[in-house]
Amino acid sequence: MDGMQLFSRPSVAALLMIATACRLMPTEAIADGAFVVDDALIGKPGECKVESWVSVASNHDFLAVTQPACVINAGIPVEAGATLLRTRSDGEWSTSAGPKAKINIIPLGDQGFALGLSGNTLWNLNTGQNIGSNINVPFTIQATKDLRININGGWLYDTTVHMGYGTYGAGFEWNFVQPLTLIGEVFGLAGQRKEGRHVTDPRAQIGLRWTPAEFIDIDVIYGRNLFGENANWFTIGLNLRF
């Protein structure tokens, strides 16, 4: 099986789009890194970060991701970055990469909510073929000082199977005690089940984030059915801000 075939399962190509969609956030934002559900915030021009994580599954699938990003001034602040990922699925390896960007449409102010827009695309570096593209609209509600709720909706086109999917997600970030944050989320795809009954089943993650200093996060996460393969996933992540 070559790299293109590795992503022939719509669940894998599609979830990679969601999981690596533009989740580039400022220092005060929480659910970035390996978490899928995005918030609507971006940072200030000149802020940069690198998010990296490794995930292993009970069925022996594997995912390693690194995402460098900086906020630039392009008339409006834009978080521009790239994704590089290495995957193993059904025993076969593949490498993919692509650009992504995010803007904030409604800032998080006294009204207690914010709205954003992000998009990304990926290419399989083994074959040179585009895997797919994703657009996402994140909506953030600051429920309390220590509790934030994020709701996502969007669209994904998987070029490996020439199918489109609606995308959805909802999550919470609860900073119940310094320096720990509990983060949980449910997300998935809406559309025709072309392959595999678990492709459009809901997916979920819950994890604990330790922030020993304002420039670093360490994540430990448990996930279920992350790529529509009905497996358990364990993730360790590291986020650096500068």
What spans do the regions from the language model cover?
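Cleavable N-terminal export/targeting peptides
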Residues: 1-35
